[in-house]
Amino acid sequence: MLSLTMLLLERVGLIIILAYVLMNIPYFKNLMNRRRTWKARWQLCIIFSLFALMSNLTGIVIDHQHSLSGSVYFRLDDDVSLANTRVLTIGVAGLVGGPFVGLFVGVISGIFRVYMGGADAQVYLISSIFIGIIAGYFGLQAQRRKRYPSIAKSAMIGIVMEMIQMLSILTFSHDKAYAVDLISLIALPMIIVNSVGTAIFMSIIISTLKQEEQMKAVQTHDVLQLMNQTLPYFKEGLNRESAQQIAMIIKNLMKVSAVAITSKNEILSHVGAGSDHHIPTNEILTSLSKDVLKSGKLKEVHTKEEIGCSHPNCPLRAAIVIPLEMHGSIVGTLKMYFTNPNDLTFVERQLAEGLANIFSSQIELGEAETQSKLLKDAEIKSLQAQVSPHFFFNSINTISALVRINSEKARELLLELSYFFRANLQGSKQHTITLDKELSQVRAYLSLEQARYPGRFNININVEDKYRDVLVPPFLIQILVENAIKHAFTNRKQGNDIDVSVIKETATHVRIIVQDNGQGISKDKMHLLGETSVESESGTGSALENLNLRLKGLFGKSAALQFESTSSGTTFWCVLPYERQEEE
């Protein structure tokens, strides 16, 4: 009996080793998580059928004299029996996959056992079917609770399965005396070994999946913590101050040697090893970062040469570089460095891939929030500066004066005032409008201003029809025209010209120009215009600052507001993508 127990333990050990290997394969772990799908069930049927066949082939042959022999057997003599781990594999198949998998594996295992032959081989087909169904029932109960049977319960089920096996031998064997003799020899070893094996097999499955869940929970906690701490800085956009704070947070929360963040052209921050030469404000040093900016794909390297830093004493030996995107365009990179290449593992790569998507989304959310605030600010500025009570009452007084002199002109101005109010309210709720709508709003505004000051301004709008559906930010031209009216001409009563034009810049971009022949802008204010508020007698200059921020936020730095100014006039322009409104 002791010899049989030791031989069975060897077979169970082989099964357990294979189970451990399988549970460390990501595909198999994923299969266990999908075990209730039919595709997964069929795959489990195949896997556990192979286990069952191996259990049959590696069984221990027992003859009438209780002699034991262990090898690989395909066929057995008619007067011998076989002790094996078949019940273990069928039982685990049912506990994992439910009744269908348990029955399928039981039938396959039983048919193969009949094919092998031996004394009363048909008994084992019957017992295998019973074991598969009963184990599957317990497995189904656990599946409904979205769990696996506990280790203790698995051991108890293993004992029950072996007892069913022994009862089947006693019930269906032709030679009852031989059946009793066989059971007295194999019952205790097989019950002990196979029940323990079942418990160990299930413990490997449960512990591996639980470990993975715990790892995911830790990663999720870390990622959420990163998100919560970095989101306020991502809202500010990618600048040196925000990038420095983000890099410090990532360095503190993750096991990395250094963290760096770059824009498309320069290092914004570098925290940790190598900070003596990876200095913010410098141009990007590593060829690795340049490759990621060019390809837009995450890259992982494990040597100093692959990093591509030209500094001879750079301690960085491995890195993973994540592209940061906004609206599909690469705006920078996040780099995590390691001084020991072995610290860059599969887990770090998975985490980095997840962070790439999260950080890019945070940048977009931050930009969207910024744009929303800017648009809201533009609405407020527009209503304050252009639709103020002063402007409104002046327009009404002008219209009232015209009623007696030229009622038709008064009616037209009243319609223009109505359109102007409506256009301001609608434009404040949109990120972009067509150039045609923007020009209509400008004309409405100019009609009211020219009615108040007849002959003071000459407005020339030179825009080809093909450009009228180009998308522009609301208030773009209106703000520039109003700026010219308020600031360019001071007290000059006539000869004041404002030209609005749109020309082709490239095959994909257009240039929008607003030009006046006013007195120009003083040199002490030129470098501030569009970058910050500029105080003057008639305003703060914040409208131009707001407009410039919206242009850069929507279309990138290349769309920034530009200007030239001399004593004979000022020209404002911006270059925008030739994006047209889709036809409905």
From Swiss-Prot:
The chain crosses the membrane at residues 6-28, 40-62, 88-110, 123-140, 155-172, 184-206. Its main location: membrane. GO terms for cellular component: plasma membrane. It is found in: Cell membrane. The modification Phosphohistidine is found at residue 390. Autophosphorylated on His-390. It catalyses: ATP + protein L-histidine = ADP + protein N-phospho-L-histidine. Signal peptide: none annotated. The keyword Hydrolase applies. Keywords: ATP-binding, Cell membrane, Hydrolase, Kinase, Membrane, Nucleotide-binding, Phosphoprotein, Transferase, Transmembrane, Transmembrane helix, Two-component regulatory system. Residues 363-580 form the Histidine kinase domain. SUPFAM superfamilies: ATPase domain of HSP90 chaperone/DNA topoisomerase II/histidine kinase (SSF55874), GAF domain-like (SSF55781). Its EC number is 2.7.13.3, 3.1.3.-. One of its GO terms (biological process) is signal transduction. InterPro entries: Bact_2-comp_sensor_kinase (IPR050640), GAF (IPR003018), GAF-like_dom_sf (IPR029016), HATPase_C_sf (IPR036890), Sig_transdc_His_kin_internal (IPR010559), Sig_transdc_His_kinase_LytS_TM (IPR011620). Disruption phenotype: Deletion significantly reduces target tissue survival during calcium-daptomycin treatment and increases susceptibility to host defense cationic antimicrobial peptides. GO terms for molecular function: ATP binding; hydrolase activity; phosphorelay sensor kinase activity. It is a multi-pass membrane protein. It holds the Pfam family HATPase_c. PANTHER family: SENSOR HISTIDINE KINASE YPDA. This is Sensor histidine kinase/phosphatase LytS. The lineage of its organism: Bacteria, Bacillati, Bacillota, Bacilli, Bacillales. The gene is lytS.
